[in-house]
Amino acid sequence: MTETGTPDGSVYDWYHRGLQLLAERHPDAAATLLARAAEAEPGSRSILEALARAQYDAGRYDEAMASFTRLISGNPTDDYAHFGLGLAASRAGELRLAAEHLALAAAMRPDVHHYAQALRGVRARRGADPS
């Protein structure tokens, strides 16, 4: 850490260290570092996607939803961002939102079978929930 409280190295270094922390199953630490990187490089889709994944893996579903939503606002045809938003919304109990974005991801990429599988799971949960 520097005297100003920022991590040592460049934003590129922070990004790669964040990915390493994710791979080592330290999502909270990864999210903290990647949030710094995203602040420094707000236009980087790679950093934002990694941040969203870290937030999701850390169980910070509302934050992950916000990050995936930012990705979608920059590229509405990003199937992975729709998938990520759908998964995060599902974990947050937002089943209608989850179904909407999982359906979009599955329609964009019918060849990615886990998109359709996640959509079926959310639809089954919605059917079991009378509210």
Where are these regions (language model features)?
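TPR-adjacent "capping" and linker segments in tetratricopeptide-repeat scaffold/adaptor proteins
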Residues: 1-13, 129-130
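Structural signature of tandem alpha-helical TPR/SEL1-like repeats
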Residues: 2, 24-36, 58-70, 92-104, ...
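Structural signature of alpha-solenoid helical repeat scaffolds
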Residues: 5-6, 39, 73, 107
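Mid-chain, well-packed structural core segment of small domains
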Residues: 67-91
